[in-house]
Amino acid sequence: MRRVILVGMLLGLAGVGWGQSADSVAPMGSMSMPHGAGNMSAHMMLSATRPLKPGDQEKADAIAAAAKAAIAPYVDYKKALADGFVIFLPNVPQKIYHFTNYSRGIAAARKFDPSMPTSLLYEKTTDGGYKLVGAMYTDRQRAPEVELDERIPLSVARWHEHVNFCKAPAGQETAYFGKDAKFGLLGSISTEKDCVAAGGTFQPNLFGWMVHVYPFEMDRKAVWSVDRDDDGDMKGLKM
């Protein structure tokens, strides 16, 4: 969860986005949060789960297989860099590092291509390198759940969005952090009215839908886990 909070907050500050707004989402609700993250449930949304339909698991398996083939050439992270992927926050300690190709993100807002994930997911190695573990697919902010389900069955995978972000006014950036945080994805402010009153800039949705896939895993549930990179702070949300 710490990585999700930091990535979401800083992407919001940078103004990066795939689309415009959100549709048909289910709030995370009550869960274990890191210290100072008691307001996180107001800033994170998950797609609703759906009953497993005939063919859903097979479709998800096929997408995972396509993802595995697509990312296999990037076992060497240096090739990813050479091919236009950019490490997000390389100097910030994270459990999972996103190597993102923003051109792919733009294309994904228009069409889903399992062979072209927006981001490659790596774990840092003890020698300072990176180990390839998965990929991330994205979709536009306006995408309804029926579209997400068409891309990857919601009975198997859950997409997530970062929402209700209040950007702090200049000089109040320290209020992003701590148990009394007001702004950002840790903040107590989660409505436009309260954000404007505090002098902030409100963003209802930071950058659209995202879903992680870990195609090298043998367990189907682990392949579409929603909390592999969350240091155990999202217990109960694994698929």
Predicted region positions:
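Primary mode marks residue(s) on the alpha4-beta5-alpha5 output face of response regulator receiver
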Residues: A26-M239
